[in-house]
């Protein structure tokens, strides 16, 4: 169990509004990229294959296919470089970690859309 002072400091740091998302969802993450002296936003769109809920240390992994090559990127949920996060579509999966998608390609790697 963590100290109450540490919990209070972590709660102050977790002030960012994060939409509800789960593994299998397609998300667009706006990432702050610094190039020289200027800063811009870069969109990283892909499928959430893993999510780690640990308060301030929460993280999620997004996978996309770029020019035929699989690219995975892990983001700290409350990191200052993550500007915004939006859910593009909801996926219907039955596992918490979708690491099996790494071995699949093309149409086999598709995820059913959740009907609400």
Curated annotation (Swiss-Prot):
GO biological process: translation
Gene Ontology molecular function: any one: structural constituent of ribosome
InterPro entries (alphabetical): Ribosomal_bL19, Ribosomal_bL19_CS, Ribosomal_bL19_sf, Translation_prot_SH3-like_sf
Cystines in this chain: none
KW Iron-sulfur (keyword) present: no
Coiled coil feature spans: none
Sorted UniProt keywords: Ribonucleoprotein, Ribosomal protein
One Pfam family in the UniProt entry: Ribosomal_L19
Annotated Gene Ontology cellular component terms: cytosolic large ribosomal subunit
PANTHER family: LARGE RIBOSOMAL SUBUNIT PROTEIN BL19M, RIBOSOMAL PROTEIN L19
Family per record: Belongs to the bacterial ribosomal protein bL19 family.
UniProt function note: This protein is located at the 30S-50S ribosomal subunit interface and may play a role in the structure and function of the aminoacyl-tRNA binding site.
Protein name: Large ribosomal subunit protein bL19
Organism: Pseudomonas aeruginosa (strain ATCC 15692 / DSM 22644 / CIP 104116 / JCM 14847 / LMG 12228 / 1C / PRS 101 / PAO1)
Gene: rplS
């Amino acid at each position: 169990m963590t100290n109450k002072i540490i919990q209070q400091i972590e709660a102050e740091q977790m002030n960012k509004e994060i939409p509800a998302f789960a593994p299998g969802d397609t998300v667009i993450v706006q990432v702050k990229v610094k190039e020289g002296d200027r800063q811009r936003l870069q969109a990283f769109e892909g499928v959430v294959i893993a999510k780690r809920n640990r308060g301030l240390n929460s993280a999620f992994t997004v996978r996309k296919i770029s020019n035929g090559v699989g690219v995975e990127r892990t983001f700290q949920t409350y990191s200052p470089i993550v500007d915004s996060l939006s859910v593009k579509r909801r996926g219907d999966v039955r596992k918490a970690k979708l690491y099996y998608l790494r071995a699949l390609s093309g149409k086999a790697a598709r995820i059913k859309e959740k009907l609400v």
